[in-house]
């Protein structure tokens, strides 16, 4: 039966792709125009198309609420790279079968591919009863004993109970509320049900975006996102991917069951390649669509180029950001094979609690205060701009607050005087400002830095990587090494030179290839070239969020004690926080000349000025009142001497 293209798309189950369509009634345009704005617009009756995908071409956004001072706002296109963050509003329209859910919602192995629903009534299974309103997580769609089933799970008392539901399972299934925050790209790829709109709340917007903000000023409200789709496919005798708008006025017939799809190009995306088993590599492929903005030699990934894909694997990268006061900051993924060398640069700490996290057993943390703090209690130390401290460990101490004894968490330090040291207790709730004093002049390769020091860590390239033509890291004023992450890569080479290989990231490099043949392995070793990859703000945000979610975040810094709190509550809170804080070695008193470098005993103004120069080198643009005050302090000290 012939359908309009729009009707076909509406009824399409994405799990059944690819599909083969025959044009029943074509559309013709005068002249020789076969493509407009990147989309096919001319087909002849009888032509056959293999549909390989349905992608969102653009998003139309509509503001739901009336904005004071604004006229009625028309729907507008929201760019795919819009750097906003959104919270999803649960769809109030129920799904009536599990089959309807799987046909319209993305379910997959990704972190984002596990949607949650609840049912209006109890669901009685063989060994389990799913209660009314209980959250059901959908994990995957699998074939079990010849029947397609949805693998589900419920969580009860910190235990997960798994079960399967058939596609025929009926009832009213509603989306659960979702408290997570998403980028527009994540919503487009995973969270917009097919044939439905998606209501979201805008929660944040990056002011680093250099395009015009499409929203009214200070808008943080509710939007309806409407996807505009495009069909992707291939045709016989053509070596490119065609794109068709569903609104194209043609009639089609699905002939998948009666047509040999092998007549068409067998196209694979980077994600498809990574899903292949390791035993299927190496393979020879032809590049059909090349990635945009790739940093590999231009001759390798060009349409029509034959390449070898040797293997897939996970590789380690160091996520780093440029240190600078103005935006936008640049972000990089640095391979551990990077051959340049780094020197340490001073870190900045906004609170005493940050000092507690940053201290290490390897060496004493030496800092200079950039902000004054007046202690309200005799037992706790006040801080002046320019004061220097050696940080030891966290403790608890009792203070009197309006006659009531209260326990507070403190950081035990030693204040550095001209020729001696003085014990100091800094409350962890102290919102001060500190800059690290660096005495280590050694040059480190990145692998040694990550082994010896705790991230995040500030560095500057001191010796560029001479094995690459242009070292982008060498031009940066300074870098903060933030996290060690693991990412997915394919190892590829030019077919004409299979021993010189390059790593390409699966998630950030979109490429389409045609499978040509298998490749016979040679015993000859690979020369693997890894590149420093510059990533976008959105990619950086997603990496930080996902990597950080894998480990428990550190406890929040203790709050300033309030008089209204009871003694019991304070003691309990102090005990809890003391347990949560990282353990550190006991404070010990050492001779002054052994605490620091031999030539730095006494800490005259030269050391401090040297530290200040490090900061100036790292960020010349900065105009920091605290740093200026330190410089004045150093100047006065020198004058007095």
UniProtKB/Swiss-Prot annotation:
GO biological process, one term: T cell receptor signaling pathway
Quaternary structure and partners: Interacts with PLCG1, ITK, GRB2, and LAT.
Name the record gives this protein: Protein THEMIS
Keyword Nucleus assigned: yes
InterPro entries noted in UniProt: CABIT_dom, THEMIS
Region (CABIT 2): 260-518
Region of interest called CABIT 1, as start-end residue ranges on this chain: 1-259
Pfam family, one: CABIT
Main location: cytoplasm
GO CC terms: cell-cell junction; COP9 signalosome; cytoplasm; nucleus
Modification after translation (UniProt): Phosphorylated on Tyr residues quickly after TCR stimulation.
Residue positions where Phosphoserine is found in the record: 584
Stated family: Belongs to the themis family.
Function in brief: Plays a central role in late thymocyte development by controlling both positive and negative T-cell selection. Required to sustain and/or integrate signals required for proper lineage commitment and maturation of T-cells. Regulates T-cell development through T-cell antigen receptor (TCR) signaling and in particular through the regulation of calcium influx and phosphorylation of Erk.
Entry's localization field: Cytoplasm; Nucleus
Keywords: Adaptive immunity, Cytoplasm, Developmental protein, Immunity, Nucleus, Phosphoprotein
Disordered: annotated span: 614-641
